[in-house]
Amino acid sequence: MLAATGSLLATIWAALHPRTLLVAAVTFLLLADYFKNRRPKNYPPGPWGLPFVGNIFQLDFGQPHLSIQPLVKKYGNIFSLNLGDITSVVITGLPLIKEALTQMEQNIMNRPLSVMQERISNKNGLIFSSGQIWKEQRRFALMTLRNFGLGKKSLEERMQEEASHLVEAIREEEGKPFNPHFSINNAVSNIICSVTFGERFDYHDSRFQEMLRLLDEVMYLETTMISQLYNIFPWIMKYIPGSHQKVFRNWEKLKLFVSCMIDDHRKDWNPDEPRDFIDAFLKEMTKYPEKTTSFNEENLICSTLDLFFAGTETTSTTLRWALLYMALYPEVQEKVQAEIDRVIGQKRAARLADRESMPYTNAVIHEVQRMGNIIPLNVPREVAMDTNLNGFHLPKGTMVLTNLTALHRDPKEWATPDVFNPEHFLENGQFKKRESFLPFSMGKRACLGEQLARSELFIFFTSLMQKFTFNPPINEKLSPKFRNGLTLSPVSHRICAVPRQ
């Protein structure tokens, strides 16, 4: 009987034309994709996408935050997108953003992971972890940052010292055109390095420069089209050369750098006298040798890299935007310098306490953040359980993107939404906080380094404005054009830093 059945199947298989098999296979895959991605009842409206890739090719990967704005007008303040294998919704408007990120944050607390991100982090660290791992790592990171100076005079003094190193590095340019990218990266990175590694690096240190270069590359390469194709077809793309392979190589080199730093720490580690984040983490690991918590070597590497990345890229990118806008708006730069001269003078180092007496400078920094808009769709969240938002059903696993671009350019909130205008943050000459200003997000998953970033921005920006006037090079035109990556950064440009007399 079995032999007869097998013979019959073999006969049928042999009779089938390869074209028939191909059509059957494609039909099966299309049906599987349809049933996997079909919209549930009360799901937010949105554009129909192609099988397997969804709406990816309907977005401009050079400016995805801008290409979704017409969809807001068409579908409303909450609409859906299918980004390959990831179902997502985009929310627009302060009321909806507040509801999603604060009032309902227990339901929308997780972090979605692309295939690429999961391979890189394995759900570890601070940025891309969720659940108990995230809670443990965030609590420990906040405590350790405070223990090693956050909000204290000691860290402020480190910022002042680093600002003086940055001033001297820029002074060496002698007022000639230069690219400020890595000078600023060096300075900002050294602050978080002093907390994580317990030391600052010389600006010419080859290991330090290599680490910053690798980080800068992955910031851009992770958002390229070929990287997105890897997220959709990893079983194919892993065999194909391309920029996605460089992303993995770079992250392995970054992990190796941190691993070597950890080994160096172990050589003279004293658990009773932790010097930095790595020492403190090593001590925490000894409390849980059975790996009952997330305090293990893999999380130490990932959390250290997350602090290094978050503590370097966002602040340094904002400072680069700040210098660019000062060169583009010399009248604003003059007002900032006049306030600095009046409150601080030309000799004394800037202090955080000066910020209260410098409303215009503070307003300029905030306006740079608004216009720079460096994380235009916020860091994504993921729905942890089936949730209803604004009358729409969001199934568990849906990615939530926050439309900060629309919020920071809302004509109902800002007098001149598309024009650099520090008056947005001033009222009767005093600094004015704005509710529709969320560069650090909101809720429990808001940026844990917000206080550090605000302090760095003020100290570094004020120190540079105190010592230099920034101008466009002769016969070179500057513009606020951006390069898309994990953050929006200014396109590569040169600038002149003329010492002030």
Curated annotation (Swiss-Prot):
EC number: 1.14.14.1
Cellular localisation: Endoplasmic reticulum membrane; Microsome membrane
Membrane topology classification: Peripheral membrane protein
Enzyme class, spelled out: oxidoreductase
Keywords: Endoplasmic reticulum, Heme, Iron, Membrane, Metal-binding, Microsome, Monooxygenase, Oxidoreductase
A biological process from GO: positive regulation of gluconeogenesis
Stretches assigned to coiled coil: none
Binding site for heme: C447
Pfam family, one: p450
Family that this chain belongs to: Belongs to the cytochrome P450 family.
PANTHER family tied to this protein: CYTOCHROME P450 2J2 (PTHR24300:SF177), CYTOCHROME P450 508A4-RELATED (PTHR24300)
Name of the protein in question: Cytochrome P450 2J6
